[in-house]
Amino acid sequence: MRGLRVLSKTIILFFAALLLASCAETKYVPDGSYLLDKVKVTVDQRPEDVSTAQAKSYARQQENVRWFSLVKLPLGVYSLSGRDSTKWMNRLLKSMGEPPVLYDSALARLTVTDLQQMLFNKGYLDSRVELWTRTKGKKLSTIYKLYPGQPYQIGRLEYRIADPVINDELGLEDSLNWGLKPGSQFRVEELDHERKRITKLLNDRGYYRFHKDFVRYEADTTGHQVNLKLVLSADKTGEGLDTLHQRYKIRNLTYESGSRQDSTIHLRKKVLRESTYIKENGYYSGSDLQNTYNHFGRLGAVKYTNIQFREVPDTTLLDCRIQLQTNKPSTVSFQPEGTNTAGDFGAAATLTYQNRNLFRGAENLSVELRGAFEAIEGLEGYSNSNFLEYSLETRLTFPRFILPFLSADTRRRVNATSEVSLLYDIQDRPEFHRRLWSAGWRYKWVPSAAPVQYQVDLLDINYVLMPWISETFKRMYLDDVSSRNAILRYNYEDLFIAKVGFGFSYNNRRTALKTNVETAGNLLQLFSSLFEAKTNELGQYKIFNIAYAQYIKGDIDFTRSIQFDYANQLVFHVGLGIAYPYGNSTLLPFEKRYFSGGANSLRGWSVRSIGPGRYKRTDGRIDFLNQTGDMKLDLNVEYRTHLFWKLDAALFADAGNIWTLREYRDQPGGQFRLKDLPEQIAASYGLGFRFNFDYFIVRFDLGMKAVNPAYDEEEHFPLLHPKLSRDFAFHFAVGLPF
């Protein structure tokens, strides 16, 4: 009941603030002027290619920002300020708030013109736009009513090419090569696309001087049809020649340093050649020019690229000069940081050496030395309570595929990197010491001009060694029959994982999709079977006297955002992961198991404090080891809004859980069963604040449990029976959750 009273007071204060803000909205609106209260767009008959959201974006004036699309609180904050600008409080309120948007009739008329042009460009040549206004006191709302009418179609279509050579190049006698199609809807943007298509095609075939102004249209309308004639004008400078537009070839190709202090280009000639699509004695190509810029631009060793062409007088030849300025090859950085792990505070520092041009081929070498210290609270019976960690990680990245028998042309066509990494990590805790060796070889590549990325982990080896475990820890957790379990024991044994994986990601700003599949132990299992290797008492094969892990794991992560205006956005997220141990393993390695709760999952719970399924400890404490699973589901929705300055806010709701695929004695109620799914789904809700500093985002999320599958009766529905001390969780994080 106390939590319900706190929640009720918060809601009352929130709505009181909204009422106060709305009452003061017109404080700074001069007499004779109006506050632009609302901008609305309606579309008659609602054709598919004319949306109200798109049309509203053409409005020259938009109303003041509404928090969560409901209330103009920034305007209210501004209106709470006084008129005395010498007082700091008034200046603060004005800087935090937003001044009123005053209605401007001239801008409204320009908006009508813009909307009419937008409809015309889409083929609605008989459209009209009406402007309506409504006033109430000092507030005014505008309504733009769009009447598109019947769209026009392309009727007759004719290509008239004055240059016979270009006419043959384009092959326009065959209508299959036309970018425009008779019978399709007339759209100005399609006409412009056709001009650009023809221009690009000719630029790529050597027509260096050709530009889209040589392409124009002649049109006449009959009924609801537009008859088009595409005219390609001649280049008058070429009169008397076989072709009126000349094709240019590259005569000389030279490289030079773009730095005045250093005349040397610190890149091998082979790297220069493979990065350059422009070829001597080849025809000029605009695409080759852009690809050359792109290829040099992604080399970390290159700071600046400038490509210039010079026409050789009285010829159709070009001299190409490529200027390159390289970055400083070596850098050293030092980064201290504070740490907080489950309330235990500490400090860490990282020293990084980076060489961006190791072998004069833009290879990137990174050597990172990290040290960390943490004071652990609440440990009894141990000789010390400090956690120490030291790690050395080396990464070498090549800006291309490192594969045998791969042609230079194939390497150039794909934006790829090859990476080899080595890691040695030392962890000394009061309870145990752990050593980790890791080695990996992976490829990443991006197809040309595509918002997708692929990754292949050709080999990823992890070797975990537990050289020492304290007698106290063994006695309390590993040897005590009442407390030990298979997951706990497996987590503190030596471990060997040799995995391969494949990942795919797609991101076009509004939609993001990430998938990843990995598997481990299959090749080792094959060799063990072929050579009839011996097994241990559990029937497991070993390598280096360690039973290696064997499993398959797949993850998919999908995010979709809907932008209402520049200040309001709705974001949906779905995450699903499944991992299955088999063959040489009956349990997943702890590092590969799923957990839920925390800043990026169910935000009503702290990290690793929910699931699997309906599992809970009898003493009510968090069980970091047992609250893991083989399967995870995350369903999230956030309504994000801009508040003021660099502060954003979000209302969120989360649902999901983790499960085991098998029934484990130590995790009762944790196995996934489809018929029990409704009772096993957890849910939470809350409010978040985010400071957006452009380069990074600092996030504070306040979550409350809504449905808790670990309990029955009243505790199963904290949404109806809230208790702040039991159901509240606070999260601090850097970056957005999805």
Residue positions per predicted region:
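Bacterial N-terminal signal peptides that target proteins for export
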Residues: 1-11
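Periplasmic polypeptide-binding modules associated with outer-membrane biogenesis and secretion
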Residues: 2-3, 24-340, 370, 552-556, ...
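Conserved active-site loop/cleft motifs that coordinate metal ions or position small ligands
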Residues: 649-652, 697-703
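A generic beta-sheet turn/junction motif
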Residues: 137, 150, 313, 508, ...
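Gram-negative/organellar outer-membrane beta-barrel architecture
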Residues: 166, 170-171, 265, 285-514, ...
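Hydrophobic, well-ordered secondary-structure elements that form the walls
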Residues: 296, 353, 396, 515, ...
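C-terminal motif of bacterial Sec signal peptides marking the signal peptidase cleavage site
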Residues: 19-22
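C-terminal outer-membrane beta-barrel translocator/porin domains of Gram-negative envelope proteins
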Residues: 339-342, 455-641, 651-674
